[in-house]
Amino acid sequence: MQPPRILFIPEVREDGTSDRSPAVLRLLRKRHEVITFPSPRDRLIYDTSRARAPRYALYAVDRLLAAVQGVRLGRKTHIELTFCETPHHALVGLWISRILGVPSVWDSHGNAAVAARSTGKGRVYTFLASALDRFLGRRVDALITVSKADAEAYEAMGVPPDRLHVIPTSVNVEEVEREAGQAVPRGTEAAKTLIFFGSYKYTPNLEALRFISARLAPYLEKEGIVCQILVAGRDLPRMDLHPSIQPVGFVEDIHALIRSADLCVVPIWSGVGILTKVVDTMATGTPLVMSRPATMGIPEIQDGVHALVATSPDRFPELVADALRNPEKMHEIAGNARRLVEARYDWRIQEPLLEDLLTKLTTGAGGSRHRGG
């Protein structure tokens, strides 16, 4: 039997990173013919520097146009399933699936209600985002979540449990090892190297960068700890940073850069789902100091076993200083973290779960299609 032909929404940049959307797309391409559906107007719609009313109007028009174009493309290419990466694109995918009579899959990166509360969004935003999540969750044929906690949050919204499937954000450990190669920490006894990385359009990452500059770096300086803090990733803002911080921008071989650091820091205090940067760092075997919220989605992480975990912003700089002063202890902790990723968060473990789900949906074994809710 031929594997199902998939319409993947939206088209994403396949840049070799461990980010969930391109990673999932690469997995799907291994066994399926995948047609990607571009969403060129997203750049304007989600540009918060632009006026709100025109963006909202464009959003409504764009969803309608995308649905029409998607149906045409789906008919032309004979798709057998839609696979969508955000709630806004899942809305389009659901319409396409209903019209063409094919199953719809939504790969949720985090529950909207939990995310809104975590990031301090207003009541109106929280209500609308939660309503869209609930609407989609009750109507798509399968809702993939990145963690059990997210699945439970959707179930509390009224999403039927049989539509929920937990497939954690993972990494390809073999690829990580190949990319990281023989990189060794570039720091010395006199000056250590720290790293933080991510996309700075994501508000929690931007807040983390400010925290590193305003609180972590000055604390280490006061303690007499000499270090350089590498800051990598897309969309680095123009802002005054502590002199010990060295912006390096987007790095293609990020795993080699992570392994070359003595310590990775993740002071994320809001957000949902599994942070790719955490799994990436654990896979490289680089020691990690992280905030308690950054452990969300990876319940196996234990403080002092897989990482040093700060329960408050005040505690975070203290743990970083402790980690830098105890490299042998951190080396052991990093080894535990890598073994956890190898056992639970390698895509080779998750890929069969994804394939099994798609097979059941397209052969009718996954339940009746187009159920209302």
What feature does the model see in each segment?
Residues 155, 170-190, 364:
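Acidic anion/phosphate-binding donor-loop and adjacent secondary structure
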Residues 329-344, 350-353:
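A short, well-ordered alpha-helix in the C-terminal region of glycosyltransferases
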Residues 17-27, 173-175, 187-247, 251-254, ...:
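Conserved catalytic-core segment of nucleotide-activated headgroup transferases in glycan assembly
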Residues 149, 167-170:
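Carbohydrate-associated surface elements
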Residues 277, 287-292:
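Short hydrophobic beta-strand element within catalytic cores of glycosyltransferases
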